[in-house]
Amino acid sequence: MARTTPIERYRNIGISAHIDAGKTTTTERVLFYTGVSHKIGEVHDGAATMDWMEQEQERGITITSAATTAFWSGMGKQFQPHRINIIDTPGHVDFTIEVERSMRVLDGAVMVYCAVGGVQPQSETVWRQANKYKVPRIAFVNKMDRTGANYLRCVEHIKTRLKGTPVPLQLNIGSEENFKGVIDLVKMKAINWSEADQGVSFDYEEIPAELLEQAQEMRMSLVEAAAEASEDLMEKYLGGEELTEEEIKKALRLRVLNNEIILVTCGSAFKNKGVQAMLDAVVDYLPAPTDVAAIDGLKLDGVTKDERHASDDEPFAALAFKIATDPFVGNLTFFRVYSGVVNSGDSVLNSVKEKRERFGRIVQMHANKREEIKEVRAGDIAAAIGLKDVTTGDTLCDEKSPIILERMEFPEPVISIAVEPKTKADQEKMGLALGRLAQEDPSFRVWTDEESGQTIIAGMGELHLDIIVDRMRREFKVEANVGKPQVAYRETIRETVKDVEGKHAKQSGGRGQYGHVVIDMYPLEAGKAYEFVNDIKGGVIPGEYIPGVDKGIREQLKSGPLAGYPVMDLGVRLHFGSYHDVDSSELAFKIAASMAFKSGYMKANPVLLEPIMKVEVETPEDYMGDVIGDLNRRRGLIEGMEDGPSGKIVRALVPLAEMFGYATALRSATQGRASYAMEFAKYSDAPNNVAQAVIEERKSK
């Protein structure tokens, strides 16, 4: 079967935003205008097409990143049909992992901002992730019809808060209840969308006289930004020549693709104005798969570099970026094809697990409706049914040309709770449910506490774990009791200790055991986790026993000698030891290494680390003193304050241990008028009194 849409006319985009910027409504309008859904689903009546889990409809927030395919030929049918794959990304900070995952497989993004709230904390997190994956992006300032809407303040925020270079493509005509439409600064025409057909038809009109001067100034800035794309254009511009509409668009596109500028559009998705022009901007300025650099990977040896270009003619390579459980067909594996073609029925290699997988049925999703297709080609996104052993981040590829595409990195959870099934019948179902949920979500972990025998679940925040427990109840019919949230403390060392010895010798009769190591232990910079350096000279320990030493240390890192928490940012250098021809074994060296670790660790000034959260509170000015006082009592470090849309914004770093129950406390202190958002910032040394209390509590257990 030949390709129906040339790859140059594909756009793989994410629509990303802060929790209440109106992203789901924006996506709904996209689906409506592209002719996919004929009735616009409103979020506030719980009927939106993209929010397809029951809980999302109840809470009015998007949790699962659903992928949808739509076609767009332009507001005035000026383009050939373009295929737009939309990945809907959640805006709540506890689901940052979903955003991270989708950024990995996107080519471009639309950042939706609220015209009233401007750039909010979660927007910064998403921005950092887009920077990390070098995703070109445009902005859509939504909710222009709301009281307090201010388009140019939002443009300013992109510069000051996100350190981006915003270039407005449009100027708004009126705002709040007088929001009428926008001025297209490239065409220098006003766009007026018809209210009779929900904004499907529109007219170009002359720019209102009172806005003409401002529009001309903004157009000059736009043309200047375009001229900076090349020396030729700059010469033409400085020489006083007019740039053509085509030259301007081509130049702006180039600068967006190079991540040099952010083009800004505006509108009100709810009032059916502006989304249409934003879709035109997606086609005009965001990349096709062929505009993006080839994807890097490694051969199966894990060392030799390899790459794949966006072409049907290269060997098949795809990345599984999401696993979802579907009530009708079981596991759905969402994947992005980077190169080649795959047909239903084909066998492929999961190169990360080195296992064969067979593509049974392949479907393309429109929110929660699905269409079966026979093949998927380079640049496309689809979901496979029935893959056996695939997790998020695995590579699926041609068996004859294996490649491992770069793996995604997932953050460590910062909060854990114990869960217990309510009845014996729930016991077995709970294990299955948690296993399935952990497969879907790599930022969620499950394990059994060896001392208490309890099942522990861990995640990125209280809301994250609430939703996991809620999904167990709804989707798997498992009732569970939930314990008190626990903070995920860590341990590390602050000093270097040299020549620490560990000797394991049992040599009385028969075959004995003998292992002897001498190591140095030293602190690593934050985020380096662990390193093992083998500095053995002259074969004093044979090569086959070295992995045993590494394993012995790694096992000790799981539970540090200080308080039994995982150890991070620690390095070990093995530089001397001895062995016995008959009695030595890998196991003996593993035991010797763990003995050395235990004896050296407590001499290396071990410290307890606690997770610190970045907290941002938006509060009316009258309550500012109370909010700051409360954050100080919670051991918070106030980083700064600024004016927000409805009062003041306070930014602080606060230990997670002090943030439990904060939502309730903030509500009562401000009569429900303040709101807050928080995300993990870093681990740092817990003060002595806190560390002592935690260590005592651990020992008493």
Swiss-Prot record:
Where does the chain bind GTP?
17-24, 88-92, 142-145
Chief place of localization: cytoplasm
Under SUPFAM superfamilies, the record lists: EF-G C-terminal domain-like, P-loop containing nucleoside triphosphate hydrolases, Ribosomal protein S5 domain 2-like, Translation proteins
* Residue stretches making up the tr-type G domain: 8-290
**Keyword Cytoplasm on this protein?**
yes
Report the locations given in the UniProt record. Answer: Cytoplasm
One molecular function GO term is: guanosine tetraphosphate binding
Name the source's superkingdom.
Bacteria
GO process terms (BP): ribosome disassembly
Annotated keywords: Cytoplasm, Elongation factor, GTP-binding, Nucleotide-binding, Protein biosynthesis
Q: Which GO terms describe its cellular component?
A: cytoplasm
Q: Does the keyword Nucleotide-binding apply?
A: yes
Family named by the database record:
Belongs to the TRAFAC class translation factor GTPase superfamily. Classic translation factor GTPase family. EF-G/EF-2 subfamily.
Its biological function?
Catalyzes the GTP-dependent ribosomal translocation step during translation elongation. During this step, the ribosome changes from the pre-translocational (PRE) to the post-translocational (POST) state as the newly formed A-site-bound peptidyl-tRNA and P-site-bound deacylated tRNA move to the P and E sites, respectively. Catalyzes the coordinated movement of the two tRNA molecules, the mRNA and conformational changes in the ribosome.
| Listed name of the protein | Elongation factor G
Record the organism: Aeromonas salmonicida (strain A449)
Give the taxonomic lineage as stored in the record. Answer: Bacteria, Pseudomonadati, Pseudomonadota, Gammaproteobacteria, Aeromonadales
